[in-house]
UniProtKB/Swiss-Prot annotation:
The keyword Nuclease does not apply. It is found in: Nucleus. Transcription factor that likely regulates the expression of the gene cluster that mediates the biosynthesis of squalestatin S1 (SQS1, also known as zaragozic acid A), a lead compound for the treatment of hyper-cholesterolemia by targeting squalene synthase (SS). GO terms for biological process: DNA-templated transcription. This is Squalestatin S1 biosynthesis transcriptional activator L3. Residues 224-254, 285-305, 585-595 have a biased composition (Polar residues). It holds the Pfam family Zn_clus. It comes from the Eukaryota. The gene is L3. Residues 384-399, 474-484 have a biased composition (Basic and acidic residues).
Length: 1232
């Protein structure tokens, strides 16, 4: 859309009038002409036709009264007399001599101008170039009214220490000559080059010559010649990567020649600078691919140098103002924007008026030999290390009437650099409070790399995520919301490719090999830094102690300058900025890190701006750059001295050529990264991660130590088997966690370390209470604190070595006691295991028998006792094991008639039990050791019991094999109750009952269990529905009978624990549906091939009278005494419940009735017993033990019932005294 002359002049004059109106309204001298709205110039402006589509002016309340045009500048000057002086007024600064810039006019870049009207105010130049003799000077004929009035065209730089003070203050840093340079010079002219191309001109060209680059395309320069746009050519732009028009400041008092070029973006994007210079469609990738050119080039073609990158033109044409816009919203948006700009221009004017008389010290002027009237170009005085301080009320405009989208970043080489310097300074930034001073922080470091050669060779570039070859910036890396989440609508601009970044993915400028570098600029004592002001009171500050060589990692923000030394190898250094997106946290981020040195009033973000060494071969890439804000302002102040170098000295760099240079630099940089990594300051997240790793390592070490002290090795000795194996002794917690991994089929060799720390022996009190004992003698710390006796067991060395006699655990091969499916490395699977001074190393191969061979078991010399720890916890050899099982069946079977002898011995000979369940073998051995004639075997009774007890503690809800596990539990309960370990027997009783319930054995003979989903038809469909078992168990008659006998023995054990102690019964009859077992003689004659029992089982019912009737109706000639024992225990359970109940009192009627009923049931049971069940002489030898057992239990029932009934009665009536019944029952037990 072309721009006509009336529309252009209208916008230009409107902006000029408003700016002057704001400045003069805030000046100390108020003229009456400001209130007069009926001047000649105002009337003339009202005659100008309004823009089409402009229906009405919408002004905010704060700007009411500003919608009317103001008189022209000339008419206002002619009619307004100079103000009278007042004592409190400040004089305005004198107007310096103006210079008229020559406009580069080319046929292709002609601008539509009006033949009847020409600009009345010439183009302005920056104060630093007013006295520059290089450009022709054209005297400006100002009206006479200008002589008494003083206007400053640019905002002077105030002292960085006094942000809130009107008077200049002394800067606290110890710098001899403190100088605050002026802003860059601004040359406004019309050119054929687009705004984006012109704004990308840089002073960091490698050659510093005026010849155009060979890779510049002239066709590209004139591609958009038909579009009229504003071109700002700066005398010197200090940009490192691609700093653009964000560095230009437009004077609020020289807008007469300004041509506004509003784009199609929204007003918010313009005001807040959320737009790249290339236009609304320019993305970060497009902006990063631009290469700044040499601003000193005579032709603007050098400004499009891409350094060999044949990239397409990224800037889009910027449409100019159309006096007749088709969109009515454009005019309203432009008015809103103009109002905002005028408001900030007023603020800038006030700021300028406050600091109008700041001047450099005379000593500094004399030292630098600069006349007071001479404006020094700040670009020539700046060094590569500056600091940026957010200045209040200092908004700047860019070339397309929007606020700058990036802060000016200037880098000049430091002429004081020493060649081959090895200083390293780490560049760190932080979120810190706005008021936090610089000297409160530490830890800045930056690398100094030796690079280059005499001809200034290029460094190889490494592809990154933001390079054109790799696809550019996408996804989360370009999400500016993570960097500046408090800016509204920022995510929308990111999606549209409009992100306010200036350093995101810019290419570094390196010196060309064909163009030698020129001499450097004179040194300056002050240093600078770059600041990006963010919303919410934060600012992003970049601080560079020195200049480093450019890094060609495209994933970082490379800020570089050409080397200025002509021939010398002054290897510079440049820090690389790696920007990482960090999510905003609810807590204050700046409180986490406070190690970065910052200047007063500077806020930095350590997480978002990280400095890493240049030329690093690391592949981390992040192209998200910190967003900018129109609040960003550039201020120069003395640099903070960097910390001393921390890196070790390296041999001098030897320049090479070609691929050798690349490889040498990568290796060298990698080595420096490794050596310098420890010196880098870690953040709160790194500290937390290190703490977590340390905790994990400590936990693993503790587990490993615990493993060494908690593994036991078990195994039987079998001289007939060449294989050997081990079983690891574990705690229940360890086995439950790792039981699925166990498989001793592939156990490996056991080895013991050369030195194992001797375990302290805990006292009996601490071991019983499961407390940690310090093993102090004669009294440990806990016993001393509790005031109890402290006793220690006698060491095993004093008891002698029990591993004698027939047992030879180490000389003979061993058979493996295994649990099925066990295959584990003890170090990994048993971190909670309890060792006996062993370090296990399972490395042996399997033997021919399918069991792992035990190749080496060495004992530590520091073992707590002299006996072999492995032999103490091994099963006996095969012969001894068969002997022990035979002793059990010969002497103890009548107490545990739940084993089918022939089937059990067959499995023992075949080794099936050794494979499936060593628990039952340990239990049998500990009981059979009581009747063994060998004293050495009897001494091992406790050891076998402890191992069986420990093995059962490892079982879970559904153990395998279920039958052998429950049988072993019965044996353990019996041994524990007779050996004095009542606590274990009581706990084991409850556990085994719950395991039986979980396996469904308690309802194996039920016909109806509706609550469990079992119906009568399920009985005929198969036992798996009744048992609820996943395994094929109880399929033949022998297994079924073993299950029945095992469950009835469990009920017997439960009643034996309940009636003497008064504890409740663990097995309720209501959930017990198992038929009475058949005669033992018939049971032992059964074979596994038989599917049905030779005799039917008597069903069990809860009604005791019905149960006695069922027993009397049996016509089997073989007397089944065990059936009567089971019925007697059912009766004993009922008596125990009535006597030990907590509900009824002794003198209540209900209690007396229950006792009378139980007494009658005892009498009925005695009368129903056959003669062979009551007389030992008439009973068969196999049943004599059961006869004695039955008589003892019947007398126990009578004694318990009668004693409770008569203990409170008077002994006077001996005839009716029931106490005699209790005494008689006790006498009968004694006689038996």
């Amino acid at each position: 859309m072309s721009l006509s002359i009336p529309g252009l002049e209208y916008c230009r004059f409107r902006q000029t009038s408003r700016a002057l109106r704001r400045i003069l309204s805030f000046s100390t001298t108020t003229s009456p002409c400001f209130a007069d709205r009926s001047t000649e110039g105002m009337s003339k402006r009202r005659e100008h036709p309004p823009l089409p589509g402009k229906q009405q002016d919408i002004w905010p309340p704060s700007l009411s009264g500003m919608e009317q045009p103001v008189p022209s500048f000339k008419s206002f000057i002619r009619k307004t007399p100079p103000p009278t002086g007042s004592p409190g007024e400040k004089p305005l600064p004198p107007l310096p001599t103006l210079h008229r810039e020559s406009v580069d006019t080319t046929p292709s870049a002609a601008i539509n101008t009006s033949p009847t009207r020409t600009p009345s105010v010439p183009f302005w130049k920056a104060p630093a170039n007013w006295d520059d003799s290089s450009t022709p000077v054209q005297e400006h004929q100002a009206p006479p009214v200008f002589s008494p009035r003083n206007y400053a065209l640019l905002l002077p730089e105030a002292s960085p220490g006094g942000l809130d003070s009107n008077e200049p203050t002394q800067w606290p840093f110890d710098v001899a000559a403190t100088h605050h340079p002026r802003l860059n010079s601004i040359d406004e002219q019309v050119d054929q080059v687009s705004l984006s191309s012109a704004c990308h001109l840089s002073a960091a060209s490698a050659s510093r010559s005026s010849s155009p680059r060979p890779d510049d395309d002239p066709s590209t320069l004139s591609s958009n010649s038909n579009n009229d746009r504003l071109v700002i050519n700066t005398t010197k732009l200090y940009s490192t990567s691609s700093e653009s028009s964000a560095s230009h400041n437009m004077s609020p008092v020289s807008p007469s020649e300004v041509m506004f070029s509003p784009s199609n973006v929204s007003t918010k994007q313009k005001v807040f600078g959320i737009e790249l210079p290339g236009g609304p469609g320019t993305t970060i990738e497009d902006w990063s691919s631009r290469t700044p050119s040499n601003p000193r080039s005579e032709t603007p073609k050098s400004g499009l140098s891409m350094q060999g990158k044949k990239l397409q033109r990224l800037n889009r044409p910027i449409s100019t103002i159309d006096p007749h816009p088709s969109d009515p919203d454009i005019s309203a948006k432009a008015q809103h924007l103009d109002a905002s700009l005028d408001y900030h221009s007023v603020l800038a004017g006030v700021y300028h008026e406050e600091h109008a008389h700041d001047a450099r010290p005379t000593a500094a002027r004399q030292k630098n030999k600069v006349p007071p009237s001479t404006r020094i170009n700040p670009g020539k005085q700046r060094s590569g290390n500056r600091e940026m301080v957010p200045r209040p009320l200092s908004w700047r405009k860019d070339s397309n009437s929007s606020f700058p989208n990036s802060a000016l970043v200037d880098i000049e080489e430091d002429p004081k650099r020493v060649p081959n310097s090895r200083k390293r300074y780490r560049k760190m930034t932080n979120w810190v409070p706005f008021h936090q001073p610089m000297h409160m922080h530490k830890g800045v470091s930056q690398r100094v790399e030796e690079t280059g050669s005499n001809n200034g060779s290029r460094y190889p570039k490494r592809k990154g995520k933001d390079s054109p070859e790799s696809g550019g910036v996408h996804g989360k890396e370009a999400d500016g919301k993570s960097l500046m989440p408090h800016v509204r609508d920022f995510a929308t601009h990111v999606k549209n490719g409009i992100v306010s970044t200036s350093h995101a993915a810019n290419r570094s400028i390196t010196s060309s090999p064909s163009q030698p570098s020129t001499a450097s600029t004179p040194p300056r004592a002050e240093q600078h830094t770059r600041l990006i002001r963010l919303g919410g009171g934060f600012a992003l500050v970049r601080q560079s102690p020195a200049v480093t060589p450019p890094s060609h990692s495209s994933s970082r923000l490379d800020i570089s300058l050409p080397l200025q030394a002509p021939v010398s190898r002054s290897y510079g250094q440049i820090p690389d900025i790696e920007v990482e997106p960090v999510s905003r946290r609810p807590s204050s981020l700046y409180s986490q890190q406070s190690e970065a040195p910052v200047a007063p009033g500077i806020s930095v973000n350590k997480r978002n701006l990280r400095i890493s060494p240049s030329l690093s071969p690391q592949t981390r890439s992040n192209t998200s750059s910190p967003p900018t804000s129109p609040l960003a302002h550039e201020v120069s102040f003395p640099r903070t001295p960097p910390p001393p170098a921390r890196s070790p000295n390296r041999p001098p760099y030897r320049p090479q050529k070609g691929a050798e240079v690349v490889e040498d630099e990568r290796v060298d940089s990698a080595n420096e990264d490794k050596s310098h990594k420890k010196s880098l300051h870690v953040g709160i997240m790194d500290m937390a991660r290190d703490a977590r790793h340390a905790w994990k390592k400590h936990h693993q070490d503790a587990k490993h130590e615990k493993l060494k002290q908690s593994i036991r090795v078990l195994g039987p000795t079998d001289p007939g088997v060449a294989a050997a194996g081990v079983l690891v002794h574990l705690t229940p917690k360890a086995f439950i966690h790792h039981s699925s991994l166990l498989n001793t089929r592939t156990m490996r060799t056991l080895t013991i370390p050369a030195a194992v720390v001797k375990r302290k022996q805990a006292c009996n009190s601490c071991r019983h209470r499961k407390r940690k004992c310090d093993a102090e003698r004669p009294v440990c710390g806990l016993c001393r604190r509790w005031g109890i006796a402290c006793e220690y067991n006698v060491p095993a060395a004093e008891r002698g070595n029990p591993a004698t006699g027939t047992a030879q655990p180490l000389q003979a091969p061993t058979r493996v006691p295994v649990l099925p499916g066990i295959n584990v490395d003890a170090r990994e699977a048993f971190p909670d295991a309890q060792t006996i001074g062993l370090d296990l190393d399972f490395t042996s191969a399997e033997s021919g028998f399918g069991y792992p061979a035990l190749q080496s078991i060495s004992q530590s010399r520091n073992a707590p006792n002299d006996q072999d720890p492995i032999a103490s916890f091994q099963l006996p050899n095969h012969d001894l094991l068969v002997e022990m099982v035979t002793l059990f069946f010969d002497n103890l079977y009548h107490l545990f008639p739940c084993f089918h002898r022939k089937e059990f011995m067959k499995q023992l000979e075949e080794g099936t039990i050794q494979k499936e369940s060593t628990l039952i073998l340990f239990s049998m051995c500990c009981l059979a050791a009581r009747v063994h004639p060998d004293a050495a075997v009897k001494k091992r009774q406790q050891e076998w019991y402890e191992q069986a007890k420990f093995s059962y503690q490892l079982t879970q809800r559904d153990p395998y094999p279920a039958l052998r596990t429950i049988q072993a539990a019965l044996l353990l309960i019996a041994h524990a109750s007779t050996a004095g370990d009542f606590s274990s027997s009581w706990l084991f009783l409850g556990k085994v009952w719950r395991q039986a319930v979980a396996l469904g054995i308690n309802r194996m003979d039920t016909r109806n269990a509706a609550s469990m989903g079992i119906k009568p038809q399920h009985w005929n469909s198969g036992h798996e529905q009744v048992y609820g078992l996943d395994k094929k168990e109880g399929r033949n008659a022998v297994e079924k009978e073993e299950y029945r006998r095992t469950l009835w023995l469990l009920l017997v054990m439960d009643r034996n624990h309940a009636w003497p102690t008064g504890w409740p019964n663990a097995l309720p009859i209501s959930h017990f549906k198992v038929d009475l077992p058949i005669a033992d003689s018939l049971f032992q004659e059964m074979t596994p091939e038989v599917q049905d029992a030779p005799s039917s089982n008597v069903p069990f019912v809860r009604n005791f009278s019905c149960l006695l009737g069922s027993l009397s109706s049996v016509t089997n000639p073989a007397v089944n005494v065990f059936q009567y024992i089971c019925v007697a225990y059912v009766l004993l359970g009922q008596v125990s419940e009535v006597v030990h109940t907590l509900q009824d009192e002794v003198d209540t009627l209900e209690y007396l009735q229950a006792c009378e009923e139980l007494d009658s049931q005892i009498v009925k049971l005695r009368l129903s017993l056959p003669r062979k069940a009551t007389s030992i002489l008439e009973a068969s030898p196999e049943d004599r033990g059961h006869v004695v057992w039955l008589q003892v239990m019947l007398n126990s029932c009578a004694m318990l019932l009668y004693y409770r009934c008569v203990k409170d009665e008077s002994p006077k009536d001996d005839a009716t005294n029931t106490f005699l019944h209790a005494v008689t029952a006790a006498q009968n037990v004694a006689q038996v």
